[in-house]
A protein has these predicted regions:
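Catalytic centers of hydrolytic enzymes
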Residues: 1-190
């Protein structure tokens, strides 16, 4: 896949320090979700990010809908109108090259869990695409996918590490109150 998307609520704990066990993986990712791949245009990806953010911020939303990604990063302005809160979306497919602006007309392969892909947490665009049958179910439980990733790191003599800041999906975050979380340490709330 070019990028991965994840709704925040699908991840239940921080990765513990020290040895990472299979039990930790299933505590981290406790749901019976499988990984699906979906072909999406850049515009559909942006629309999906907006939908996840709207479901986080609006109408008593849930922080579990907040969009996280790998190979994709963006700025968030929660004080902007719904539909225009996500900006400066950049992509680095497979984290194999350099970051550049997403092409709204290009098609990208996205991997994500089946709950989110089916429109869960307000990801309506994803639900429309997959509802039309446009997805591939890998039949890999997402916890198992993470276990495989950790095993591959271990076999290569590496360990889980905190991501470098340039790989964080949220580049900057301005709250509904207009506080810029990326420059002000005492911001409160969404």
């Amino acid at each position: 896949a070019d990028i991965a998307l994840q709704n925040g609520g699908g991840v239940r704990i921080d990765i513990p320090a020290g040895e990472f066990t299979i039990a930790d993986a299933f505590t981290l990712l406790p749901f019976s979700n499988t990984l699906w791949t979906v072909e999406l245009t850049g515009q559909q990806i942006i629309d999906s990010l907006e939908e996840g953010l709207a479901n986080t911020l609006d109408n008593g939303g849930s922080s579990g809908a907040y969009p996280y990604a790998s190979g994709l990063r963006f700025d968030v302005n929660a004080s902007a109108a719904a539909g225009s809160r996500i900006s400066n979306v950049e992509i680095n497919p497979r984290l194999a090259g350099s970051w550049g602006p997403i092409d709204v007309g290009a098609t990208y392969t996205v991997v994500l869990n089946n709950f989110q892909a089916s429109g869960g947490d307000g990801y309506n665009t994803l639900g429309e695409v997959t509802g039309a049958g446009n997805f591939v179910d890998t039949f890999t439980e997402y916890a198992q996918g993470f276990i495989d990733y950790v095993e591959n790191l271990t076999e290569a003599g590496l360990s889980l590490q905190k991501l470098p800041l340039e790989e964080y999906s949220t580049k900057s975050y301005i709250s509904r109150a207009g506080c810029d979380h990326s420059t002000t340490a005492d911001c409160e709330g969404y």
